[in-house]
Amino acid sequence: MQRLIFHVDVNSAFLSWEAARRAAAGEADLRLIPSAIGGDRDKRTGIILAKSIPAKAFGVTTGEPVGMALRKCPQLVLAPPDFRLYSKNSNAFIAVCRRYAPVVEQVSIDECFLDMTGTGLLYPDPVAIAHIIKDTIFSELGFTVNVGIAPNKLLAKMASDFEKPDKVHTLFAHEIPQKLWPLPVGSLFSVGRSTAEKLTAARIRTIGDLAQADLAYIQRLTGVKLGKLIHDYSNGIDDAPVLSEPEAVKGYGNSVTLEQDVTTLAQANQILLALCDSVASRMRADSRRCACVTVTIRGNDFRNRSHQRRLPEPTDVTAELYAMSRTLFSELWDGVTPLRLLGVTLNDLCGDDAVQLSLFRDEKKERARKLDQTVDQLRGKFGVTAISRGSVTDASRRVGRKYKAELDPGQK
């Protein structure tokens, strides 16, 4: 039986979700004006997390500092990130997908794969049911998605990127020569900038050129493992299964997928800080501490890699969790591979009253815990954007707050 995989991707998720909320309240639709999510307009700090199509026309790009974006587009409407809203909408669109698909794999806050294999009796026309899913999400939730239809995850994801927004695209095996092969080789997943430059220098300019090239030659150019992977991808070969989500881990997790890859340690550290800040705050709100930290990264090959480590003792202190996350990240990342996703998970939990008291008071930890409590109280009273936590170390403080971004709840 041929597999049938859908990839459902929210169009400019953060901006679309904020726009839908404002449109429901009778305000201007952010999707139709120069607008963006992220940062502080008055302080001109933070980064652009998402942008509208009109903002893109002014040259505004995801990941750039707010100050730079405002110089390009002085009339840019900025909305602060609201991760409770994002989590709510993410759960809602996944719930719609579950009505139609027997197996759903959520791969980030704004995208999922549906394994529709064997549903032909229920849904004889895959394109028709994809339109129903897409239109149901819009009519019930107020935002648009793209749906890619293909025999595997790679082609489904490529298809969902063809033309946006609010579109359904197919990419079956017989369509590969017409739809996939003419695309620039750099648009193929797992082909990063440096790999694309090597291939282009060797006159391999399109995905079709790569597909028809000799595998051994590609491996000499790019390495044995990567060469085999991208050669397979260029020919539409991918056997990765759609994985139903396992039983929920008893922990707290945050993850984020960025439109622009993370390529520097400074960017990664600031995102890790934001993740730890957000997830630790939620853990403290439940009067819990964790004894284990896990850091997850994902490159352009769709594969997650994780490291975890136990702490000397359970903690709820953001600075300690951030320090451990940085250590784990340094063990995971080679410093070269562009990263699309970063995640932090806290588990092996206990109540904050179950921690063994020490005979010797750690004043540094107590100061850090009081700082965390103060930040939590201010945010609880004035909102999550009321106070922005600076870098934990002097080294990362030099980068400043411009890469600061709290990110989506991934578990609790």
Where are these regions (language model features)?
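Gly/Gly-Pro- and Ser/Thr-rich, intrinsically disordered tail segments characteristic of DNA damage-repair
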Residues: 1-229, 235, 281, 365-412
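Short, charged/polar surface micro-motifs in flexible loops or helix N-caps
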Residues: 11-13, 41-44, 300-303, 349-352
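Short glycine-enriched, charge-decorated loop/helix-capping segments at active-site entrances
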Residues: 53, 122, 309-312, 360-362
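Short, compositionally biased low-complexity segments
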Residues: 65-72, 102-111, 240-252, 296-300, ...
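Short, hydrophobic beta-strand segments
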Residues: 113-118, 306-309, 356-361
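A glycine-rich phosphate-binding loop feature that marks nucleotide/adenosyl-phosphate handling sites
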Residues: 151-154, 232-235, 289-300, 339-350, ...
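DNA-contacting surface of Y-family translesion DNA polymerases
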Residues: 187, 195-339
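C-terminal hydrophobic structural anchor segments
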Residues: 315-316, 320-380
